[in-house]
Amino acid sequence: MSEKIRVLLYYKYVSIENAQEYAAKHLEFCKSIGLKGRILIADEGINGTVSGDYETTQKYMDWVHSDERFADLWFKIDEENQQAFRKMFVRYKKEIVHLGLEDNNFDSDINPLETTGEYLNPKQFKEALLDEDTVVLDTRNDYEYDLGHFRGAIRPDIRNFRELPQWVRDNKDKFMEKRVVVYCTGGVRCEKFSGWMVREGFKDVGQLHGGIATYGKDPEVQGELWDGAMYVFDDRISVPINHVNPTVISKDYFDGTPCERYVNCTNPFCNKQIFASEENETKYVRGCSPECRAHERNRYVQENGLSRQEWAERLEAIGESLPEFVGA
């Protein structure tokens, strides 16, 4: 039996001097022990997800905790059967989550160490979900929400996180005077965003401490009131959260049947994320439209070594055709 792989999800807002140099040092250590993953380091802190066997991940956690700046850093641990990453990246960025307040004329950035929403543990958050007078706001990207979300949570009409402040300003009259609680995958986005809401004048702002990942592991709530699966930014794509009464809410793009399998459209210039079974991915050569399925840069065709004839036959089977100028 192969050894279990541990996936570590973590972040910490803390001032890091010479953050760019520290990022290079961090990458060197990770590579030296064979760790895989993706880590962002900025002047404001660190945010990462990494994977490896028990020994490797333990070495990494011990090394991180040996630095007094990260002595109390909270690692959220998942056990998996295979690696969640193929390579190791450590990058220096302006922010460890891209809210982009300064770039989008929202005044100065937020320091969560100074201003942030009230921390709610899983039990308190569940109570908020059941409270009709509380507004629950999902702060993640739209495609994350579509895979899974808390029951009754608002889905902002946004494509990504940095669009959220404008959406809130456009809709603040709907919940300005209400209690608002926010949530995200591991907590890092909510730390900053809930602080921004406080600065905007919202009087009662809470956040799920530790994020969805912690809610799903809590022995008391066991992920209850979560519908679907949780999107993660690694090779797993999704992980289960609700261990009481799990459901599948996402539907196959092609036939509408329950499906939690995300793929990217075969056309690299589209790249739309869609839910598709392996059968339908094959049938529709992973394209979200006739134009994408017949695109000359069709990645599915290239990855699977389909000849032009095989490609044309796939399209003919669904009533479409391959233009004369397109070649495999």
Swiss-Prot record:
Keywords: Oxidoreductase, tRNA processing. Residues 130-224 form the Rhodanese domain. GO terms for biological process: tRNA modification. It holds the Pfam family Rhodanese_C. The active site is at residue 184. It catalyses: uridine(34) in tRNA + AH2 + O2 = 5-hydroxyuridine(34) in tRNA + A + H2O. Its EC number is 1.14.-.-. SMART domains: RHOD (SM00450). GO terms for molecular function: oxidoreductase activity, acting on paired donors, with incorporation or reduction of molecular oxygen. Signal peptide: none annotated. PANTHER family: RHODANESE-LIKE DOMAIN-CONTAINING PROTEIN 7-RELATED, THIOSULFATE SULFURTRANSFERASE/RHODANESE-LIKE DOMAIN-CONTAINING PROTEIN 2. Belongs to the TrhO family. Catalyzes oxygen-dependent 5-hydroxyuridine (ho5U) modification at position 34 in tRNAs. This is tRNA uridine(34) hydroxylase. It comes from Streptococcus pyogenes serotype M2 (strain MGAS10270). The lineage of its organism: Bacteria, Bacillati, Bacillota, Bacilli, Lactobacillales.
